[in-house]
Amino acid sequence: MKKADILVLDFGSQYTQLIARRLREQGVYAEILPFNVSLADIKAKEPKGIILSGGPASVYATDAYFCDKGIFDLNLPVLGICYGMQLMAHHYKATVAPAGHKEYGKANIEIKKDNALFKNLPKKQTVWMSHSDKVENLPQGFEVLATSENSPFCVFGNEDKKFFALQFHPEVQHSEFGKNILKNFAKYACNCESIWNMGSFAKTQAEKIREEVGNDKVLCAVSGGVDSSVVAALLASAIKEQIIVVFVDNGLLRSGEKEQVEFMFKNTLGIDLISIDASEIFLSRLVNVTDPEQKRKIIGNTFIEVFEEEAKKHKDVKYLAQGTLYTDIIESSVVGASKTIKSHHNVGGLPEKMNLKLIEPLKEIFKDEVRALGLELGLSKEVVYRHPFPGPGLAIRIMGEVNRASLELLRKADVILLEELKSTGWYDKTWQAFCVLLNVKSVGVMGDNRTYDNAVCIRVVDASDGMTATFSHLPYEILENISRRIINEVEGINRVVYDISSKPPATIEWE
């Protein structure tokens, strides 16, 4: 079992993943586990500290979430955040009750006592609150470390036990010294060293791959995106003579994608590529399918069938490698008290029985870490900083049924969007940009004629790891040019809209 410096127990907060991200940015390896993980599994990870995340529940409610009480007897530092703070207070017999004044947003706190968390930080600072319950009295054995206008127990702790509790969220950007607070917990309370980086990760993963695979061969599925490209490069660094790299044209690719991928692997990466045209089988199975979860699962199952058929043509192929990320795992499974968001075609969309064993060397890291790993492995910036493209391709960017006509419309619109962003320098400033073909038509006027055609939505977002995102504030003149060109150049589209929702509450992809 892989060891972790710090374990984050997930009680359902939308910010839980950010806790792990902030620690990893400091060179400390943090891993997220469900709140009800067993004490034995915690001990097996040999952590140096534990963090209890926030969450939507109330500790006094009948449906409250509780972790194993034994974590408070492991002689390990524990940091409780929001719900985690209230859980710690409740465990040590303090009263937690509904707050008369709910706090959502920025608040000012004042440090009342020097302590490990706030070492070398200002006495007054701005933090981000998001809670509707409050701790009414100090738990026995603890002391107040900081206060806010609405909370005399905003931060409390027991420095002998190295237990600390925060009512606010240090993991979000709005807490101005939040990253420093988490770093201080790791460094001064847990004695963690900042030694985890992509160089050490690459070395460890290469060793694991060699050990697991032995003399067998690995089928490596690639899409041309950064995730699968990094997987291929990592496998090549470990077992180059044992990998068979396969690209499947599922008929759901962007314009020119197949040719770009083939050129990149053969000429830029120097890796032999087997290209399979399976567009007919994919598109035939998507006829009359409109439900997004069904689309993902059909595509996931079909990919595996195609890969397994290819594997039969080669001797000793026992493994299938994929570019599954930590974010895919999180969104496709129930982690702690968090809910499933969507099935990813290479996680929740996989069939239960496969003839090939899975290798997912990136499943413990986030997107920005994958990019750093790619650079570490010698991939070019052009490859590493390509915008993410989902495994199910354009199928989940077409609302409703997928067919050749709708795919052609979407491809043409997408080409224009990317051309405009690249020519204005905005492509490299954004995380992801794409068009969505909506399953609605609208009335328009072109020339002197009435039209009743399709609408396209433009989605352009800024993000660092894909767990959260905000819509990109593109200049109006760029949006105007994109809209004008799509409507004038793509017959069958008469309306363009811009998606200004953030993640959360929306996801980046529409399906």
Swiss-Prot record:
It catalyses: XMP + L-glutamine + ATP + H2O = GMP + L-glutamate + AMP + diphosphate + 2 H(+). ATP binds at S223, G224, G225, V226, D227, S228, S229. InterPro entries: Class_I_gatase-like, GATASE, GMP_synth_C, GMP_synth_GATase, GMP_synthase, GMPS_ATP_PPase_dom, NAD/GMP_synthase, Rossmann-like_a/b/a_fold. The active site is at C82, H169, E171. Pfam families: GATase, GMP_synt_C, NAD_synthase. One of its GO terms (molecular function) is ATP binding. The keyword Ligase applies. Residues 5-195 form the Glutamine amidotransferase type-1 domain. Residues 196-386 form the GMPS ATP-PPase domain. Keywords: ATP-binding, Glutamine amidotransferase, GMP biosynthesis, Ligase, Nucleotide-binding, Purine biosynthesis. One of its GO terms (cellular component) is cytosol. Its EC number is 6.3.5.2. Pathway: Purine metabolism; GMP biosynthesis; GMP from XMP (L-Gln route): step 1/1. It comes from the Bacteria. Homodimer. Catalyzes the synthesis of GMP from XMP. PANTHER family: GMP SYNTHASE [GLUTAMINE-HYDROLYZING] (PTHR11922:SF2), GMP SYNTHASE-RELATED (PTHR11922). This is GMP synthase [glutamine-hydrolyzing]. It comes from Campylobacter jejuni subsp. jejuni serotype O:2 (strain ATCC 700819 / NCTC 11168). The lineage of its organism: Bacteria, Pseudomonadati, Campylobacterota, Epsilonproteobacteria, Campylobacterales. The gene is guaA.
